[in-house]
């Protein structure tokens, strides 16, 4: 195994100091962790600085920490914030590296086989390698991840044991090093020097680790001994400085040595023979032929190259696992005594539970029809109970914890006071009779004060009818539905903030992650229709959208008071009472949050003038112009990723895909 560097403590850097009930929350969470408490809930209202509290806890308990978010966008936001709080420590980002992913599948009804098709984001692949190598080299590591962290990744022991350790003065020949690099999936490329490659010039070997993007390493030999090792700029070759120890981890997470490879191939062949016998006994000759052809090709590739497309489907044999045994995941790269934080746990834990079943249903079809061996079923995400077995200590973070989290612990730490002094909004319940006229009057009041309005409906038809009605009444309104692409959704939110329009109508899009301080009114139609979007948790999340403005107000239109409505209203009133008392005791005057409005992405046309998406008519562009636009966008996407603005990079990626579909 790799010797980890000396323990380096987490060092939190921030211009803020804990305020409101943050100090109490931080102290309670830390005391409970140090006291051995396994699970806790941080029940933090919208806008109370939960990420800052999480950072304070990490810095005080000083444990490697995994933070899991329920989508890439939120993970990117958290990564950026933790990176600012811990500039001297290893803050890593681990999400799915696919820009586009079509999983392998088979549809028996139409006899359609869909081959796996994917586009890997090179920047995210680099960050994934950076995360795993950091975890094996040091302890001061925070990894912000999506639920990708519960998917199979390859054995951390094989990954660490395959690493090549180099020091000046070490006796090793140049050719031996080259062979070792090839064994761990590095490619020789003397022309195009990029991640996962090495090049050779006489007695000098330059290696570009998979976890880097700008800096590579130069290993200089004197005979069969390493003379010196330098860190260099990959583009210019300029020396940055000498290093006294270099560890090169494999260029892929699925790696095995020659001895294990032969053992793995023998197991694959044995399973193939068994499955072929089964198919032939059932008269499934087509399936048998299909399976033999595909598996024998993969075996040949593994034998000759040490790798094959879809190698992860053989991971059970490569890792030496028993049938049904869970795969290795990112969680296995952490030491035993690590901390897990689940952001927006009411959403994330549901995702963790659901991943396994969907994956198994698709793969079972591939196995039944001879596209994969049964062992492919063991290349899968963890079941929830398997995830739980990795948990040493965990903090669930949410404004509305789910039933699962509440069943795991009775330790709930509340964080209700906002540093800005903002209160939870007041709530009115009004009858649905005459709601259109009443709502129109409320909207006009907000327009007069240059404030914005969210309206949430239960059905697409209701949203469309309401949009048409408000437009007829002269209101500047937009309807945001599920068909709208990520980039366009961001533009709609930006236009709402700028006042291009005043009212935004949606169904399930106005909950977590939509942060518009200009919104002072949230109207909930059909609030008394019990269900997923009108349960207590959904209502509290929707109410939270009005908690960023000092004049925040919520109107529920309903003909009866449901239990969910009453609980949401009571909880909001309880929080509001605590907030008012705190403000009064400390002389705090609530202020609306001030938040910059980020500019739209602009791209270069043939004239090289920066023109936003709104101003560009892609439909009328020639194919050549669209190609130039795509090239410019790809460059800007790379720049955004390098600046760690993954939300922006994801938006650019979505626009690139839209443009490519036009050709």
UniProtKB/Swiss-Prot annotation:
For binding ATP, which residues are annotated in this chain's numbering?
Answer: 44-51
- One Gene Ontology term from the biological process aspect of the record: nucleotide-excision repair
Give me the ranges of the annotated region Disordered: 1-23
Q: What family is it from? A: Belongs to the UvrB family.
Out of the domains of life, which is the source?
Answer: Bacteria
- In UniProt terms, what function does this protein have? The UvrABC repair system catalyzes the recognition and processing of DNA lesions. A damage recognition complex composed of 2 UvrA and 2 UvrB subunits scans DNA for abnormalities. Upon binding of the UvrA(2)B(2) complex to a putative damaged site, the DNA wraps around one UvrB monomer. DNA wrap is dependent on ATP binding by UvrB and probably causes local melting of the DNA helix, facilitating insertion of UvrB beta-hairpin between the DNA strands. Then UvrB probes one DNA strand for the presence of a lesion.
- The Helicase C-terminal domain extends over 435-601
Bias (Basic and acidic residues) ranges: 1-10
Q: What is the designated name of this protein? A: UvrABC system protein B
GO CC terms on record?
A: cytoplasm; excinuclease repair complex
- What are the protein's UniProt keywords? ATP-binding, Cytoplasm, DNA damage, DNA excision, DNA repair, Excision nuclease, Nucleotide-binding, SOS response
Q: Which GO terms describe its molecular function?
A: ATP binding; ATP hydrolysis activity; DNA binding; excinuclease ABC activity
Domain called UVR: residue spans: 627-662
Q: Does the keyword Cytoplasm apply?
A: yes
Give the chief site where it resides.
Answer: cytoplasm
Q: Which residues form each disulfide bond in the chain?
A: none
Give the residue interval(s) assigned to the motif Beta-hairpin.
97-120
- What domain notes does the record hold? The beta-hairpin motif is involved in DNA binding.
Gene that this sequence comes from = uvrB
Q: Where is the Helicase ATP-binding domain?
A: 31-418
Q: How does it assemble?
A: Forms a heterotetramer with UvrA during the search for lesions. Interacts with UvrC in an incision complex.
Q: Where in the cell is it found?
A: Cytoplasm
């Amino acid at each position: 195994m790799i010797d980890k560097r000396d323990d380096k403590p987490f060092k939190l850097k921030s211009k803020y100091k804990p305020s409101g009930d943050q100090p109490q929350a931080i102290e309670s969470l830390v005391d409970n962790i140090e006291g051995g408490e396994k699970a806790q809930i941080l029940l933090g209202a919208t806008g109370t600085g939960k990420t800052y509290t999480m950072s304070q806890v990490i810095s005080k308990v000083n444990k490697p920490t995994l933070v899991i978010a329920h989508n890439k966008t939120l993970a990117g936001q958290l990564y950026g914030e933790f990176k600012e709080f811990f500039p001297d420590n290893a803050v890593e980002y681990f999400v799915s590296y696919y820009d586009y992913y079509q999983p392998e599948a088979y549809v028996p009804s139409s006899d359609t086989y869909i081959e796996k098709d994917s586009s890997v984001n090179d920047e995210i692949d680099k960050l994934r390698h950076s995360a795993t190598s950091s975890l094996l080299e040091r302890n001061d590591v925070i990894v912000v991840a999506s639920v990708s962290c519960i998917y199979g990744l390859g054995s951390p022991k094989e990954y660490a044991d395959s690493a090549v350790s180099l020091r000046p003065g070490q006796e090793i020949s140049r050719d031996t090093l080259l062979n070792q690099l090839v064994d761990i999936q590095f490619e020789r490329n003397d022309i195009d020097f990029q991640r996962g490659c090495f090049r050779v010039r006489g007695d000098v070997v330059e290696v570009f680790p998979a976890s880097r993007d700008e800096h590579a390493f130069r290993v200089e030999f004197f005979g069969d001994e390493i003379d010196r090792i330098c860190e260099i700029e990959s583009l210019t070759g300029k020396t940055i400085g000498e290093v006294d120890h270099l560890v090169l981890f494999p260029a892929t997470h699925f790696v095995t040595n020659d001895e294990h490879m032969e053992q793995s191939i023998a197991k694959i062949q044995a399973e193939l023979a068994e499955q072929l016998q089964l198919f032939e006994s059932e008269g499934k000759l087509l399936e048998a032929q299909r399976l033999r052809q595909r598996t024998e090709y993969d075996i040949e590739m593994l034998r000759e190259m040490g790798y094959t497309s879809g190698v992860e489907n053989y991971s059970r044999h490569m890792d030496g696992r028993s049938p049904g045994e869970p795969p290795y995941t990112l969680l296995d790269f952490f030491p035993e005594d690590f901390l897990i934080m689940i952001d927006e746990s009411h959403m994330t834990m549901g995702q963790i539970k659901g991943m396994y079943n969907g994956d198994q249903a698709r793969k079972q079809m591939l196995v039944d029809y001879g596209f994969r061996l049964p062992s492919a079923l063991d290349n899968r995400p963890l079941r929830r109970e398997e995830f739980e077995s990795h948990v040493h200590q965990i903090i669930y973070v949410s404004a509305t914890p789910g039933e699962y989290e509440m069943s795991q612990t009775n330790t709930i730490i509340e964080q209700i006071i906002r540093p800005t002094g903002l209160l939870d909004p007041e709530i009115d319940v009004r009858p649905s009779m005459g709601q259109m006229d009443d709502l129109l009057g409320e909207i006009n009041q907000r327009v007069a004060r240059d404030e914005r309005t969210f309206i949430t409906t239960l059905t697409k038809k209701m949203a469309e009818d309401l949009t048409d009605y408000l437009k007829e009444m002269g209101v500047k309104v937009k309807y945001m539905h599920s068909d709208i692409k990520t980039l366009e959704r961001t533009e709609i939110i930006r236009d709402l903030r700028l006042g291009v329009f005043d009212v935004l109508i949606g169904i399930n899009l106005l909950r977590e992650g939509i942060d518009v301080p200009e919104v002072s009114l949230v109207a909930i139609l059909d609030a008394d229709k019990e269900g997923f979007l009108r349960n207590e948790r959904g209502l509290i999340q929707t109410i939270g959208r009005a908690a960023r403005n000092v004049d925040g107000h919520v109107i529920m239109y309903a003909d009866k008071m449901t239990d969910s409505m009453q609980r949401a209203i009571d909880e909001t009133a309880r929080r509001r009472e605590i907030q008012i008392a705190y403000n009064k005791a400390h002389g705090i005057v609530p202020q609306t949050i001030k938040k910059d409005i980020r500019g739209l992405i602009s791209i270069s046309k043939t004239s090289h003038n920066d023109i936003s998406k709104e101003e560009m008519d892609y439909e009328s562009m020639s194919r050549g112009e669209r190609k130039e636009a795509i090239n410019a966008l790809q460059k800007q996407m790379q720049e955004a990723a390098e600046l760690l603005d993954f939300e922006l990079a994801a938006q650019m990626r979505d626009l690139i895909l839209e443009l490519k579909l036009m050709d």
